[in-house]
């Protein structure tokens, strides 16, 4: 388990290099035994690719593997991404939720934005980001 956590922390540190100034990285495993190391690495790689393309300005990136969606967002950060990978079926679909404050509104107020993506396994075992919704 320690090797798995160390490996994922290394992957997350590398993936954050394209994510601007990163002030904190944390990984929480509450039910990681449900997934193999390969599955967790595949999800991390898919998330890395997705966030590198879509979220260049993040300052805090937290990735969690757990069963309970965590919607905590710290108001003192301009951008905070807290990503929860939640099993929606046995092993083939995970929900990735991103919650952040966006102060780019025309009236200069902070809006709490939640974007949801469904990550699905492909026939070759890789993960990709599927459907998307925003609230």
Model-derived features: where do they sit?
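Flexible low-complexity loop/turn motifs enriched in small/helix-breaking residues
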Residues: 17-111
């Amino acid at each position: 388990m320690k090797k798995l956590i160390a490996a994922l922390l290394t992957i997350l540190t590398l993936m954050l290099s394209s994510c601007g100034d990163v002030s904190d990285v944390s990984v929480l495993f509450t039910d990681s035994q449900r997934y193999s190391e390969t599955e967790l690495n595949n999800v991390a790689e898919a998330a890395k690719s997705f966030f590198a393309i879509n979220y260049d300005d993040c300052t805090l990136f937290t990735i969690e593997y757990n069963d309970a969606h965590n919607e905590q967002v710290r108001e003192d950060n301009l951008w905070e991404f807290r990503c929860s990978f939640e099993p929606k079926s046995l092993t083939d679909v995970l929900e990735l939720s991103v919650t952040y404050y966006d102060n780019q509104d025309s009236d200069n107020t902070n809006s709490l934005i939640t974007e949801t993506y469904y990550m699905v396994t492909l026939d070759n075992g890789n993960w990709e980001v599927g459907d998307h919704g925003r609230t």
